[in-house]
Amino acid sequence: MKLETSLTDRDRLKKVGLIFSIGLTIFLFWFILLSYVFAFKRLMLLSWLALKRLIARVARLFLTLFSRDRKISNSEGSFFVRMHKRIYARAVVEFFNALQIKNSQSGIKLLNFFIEKCKRLDASAQIISSTAGMAISLGENKEALRLLSILIERYPSDVSAQQQVGVKAFILGKYKLAEIIWTLCSAHREDLIIKLGLDKLKARFLAPSWYLAIGHIAHLDIYLKHKILNGHVDHKTYFSLPAGMQLPNSNLMSYWSDYISTLDKDTLKNLSPNKIGILQDEFWSIPFEDGKSRMFSHAGSMVQQRWEAEERTPLLNIKPADRLRGEDTLRELGVPANSWFVCLHVREPGFHLKWHKSHPGTRNADIETYLPAARELVARGGYVIRLGDSSMRPLTKEKGIIDYALSKYKSEFMDVFLCGACRFFIGTNSGLGLIPPIFGIPCAMTNWSPIGLPQWYLKDVYIPKLIFSERLSRNLTFEEMLFSEAGWSQFEKYLVKSGLQTIDNTPEEITELVLEMLDKINGEVTLTDNDQKLRKTFNDLVLRADSYIGAQLGMGFLRRHQALLATSTTI
């Protein structure tokens, strides 16, 4: 019986087939893993081959279904080929990670197996990129760079796959290696842009990595300032949200409309997706005039220092209409007209619960330890508005402290308005803390982790979590933190394996920093000669450790813990 399919039926078959193939892929992946655990090596290899063939056959089945009543288009054909390669590459990575955790020797063997695969001319960009990532996770950095060279040579236009090698290094906390990779990728991309004549377009497109989190959207501040400082204002930047992707905060994105244009059909008509991919700028790093690409944090410090040295004003201001609307909502929240308020946001695991369960981090804190500081601000005539999401632990009702996060007034609009209209912002290491500075609002950042990557805005102050060593039976010095993984990792597993644990800031330390920020805003901070000396000693240490100057360490905290400035003999 001849199978006839309408366009709707074909779409339905495509969806069903995708679900079926992904489900079967996951099943086979776990079957392979169990085979490995119970030493059924022959069964494991057979299952692995079956997994690869399954994906290829499903893709071919789709092609057959489409071609029964019409010729398949090139775009549809390439879609299925890409689907096959991406699922296969992802399965490779997941399988490798599982093996590596159990036995690093097995990881090395599997890495060598895939290195041989990469030598074949038909090896996909995804497989080469994923194998380079495997090499990085095993400390085989030279091999990773060699694979990157192969990737660039064979797939010069696949900028995204090249960049992902650097992202893998970044996720593993190998920031210097990530910058080396991004520098190589950037140099290749610029050569390619000139070779293809794309530089004449004077256009750039924002890559999907800019829309992953609200902090990424806020970091457009640094991206655009860098562009302005280097005289590239005539280069247009385009924004286009990929299908199936949702903005973390569309209201914040709309604030960039004076600097970023929405991609339209007229712009697209003369540009292939391939060329747009080449012209996409990623969130992770920014290329500088010296030829080096710097990670977003280090780039942020360099750009912001120059911006403030030239006495330039913030790019964004709360719009007049938004201010009127926001002030109306403030009154409904219980903040009288002409009253000042401070925003408070303390990171909790609920918003990224799934991620936190699989990757326990060091950036969360206890909201209860912030209440003494909040009460002190209320006693001084202010209001404290707690920001966050619906997963936050509820606050006990207190005069002047407003739990906006769990109120009916919570919205994307008010999130941005509150961050841009408060006197200052009290926060932890979270993307929301990057919104106030783009409106020129200073931040007092607490329980900061890791110490090696502070917020990069110079008007901010911060206090880090300290780290206790079970082996040494004491807290690590600042030098010991900054010159080891302890000062750069935001994941607990790296600390636990070294017998280390983070120590949260005390309520007294938090209150001290908050009042220090209030005094700073009011122009009432006076530093002694000894204070200046302590700060210089700490900043010199930070630069020596290849970190950067951004937010200043709280002076009260530095006085309390000045013993941690001692030179260490354990690193």
At which residue positions do the language-model features occur?
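N-terminal targeting/anchoring "stem" of glycan-biosynthesis enzymes
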Residues: 2-40, 44, 51-67, 71-106, ...
